[in-house]
Amino acid sequence: FDVVYSVYAVGWTTDLQTTFNLISSYLKKDGSFIFSWDHPFMHCVDETEGRLLFSGSYHEAEPFTFQKHGNPLTLHNRRLCDYINTLSKAGFAIERIVEETDSETMNRDVEFTSGYYSSTKAKKFPLSIIIKARKL
């Protein structure tokens, strides 16, 4: 393929290296891999009564489990360097990293979730990250 893209899916993998290696195997030389996921800060900052508090460590690259609609959900905390270094090991070169939040999200007067994706957070740091990498 010339392009492989993933919209908010890569973060669900339990084995990032294997996932990136497989994606690399599907791409032609110089093909692009573009993906988005929650910004790495998202897992360590909580909002309480309009205040942002560090509730975890950015450095903890470990899986964590929480309840969603009464069911356990496990995700893996990954730092930006985890994505970059794993992409590099899979034969990719980083072409672009986007750390932005759209102005509509930042300017909402009413919070649109229970605090995970919130305008309060969006005004202080990006909620998501987009990485574009090229297969070498």
Each PLM stretch: what is its role?
Residues A90-F92, T113-L136:
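Core SAM-dependent methyltransferase catalytic element
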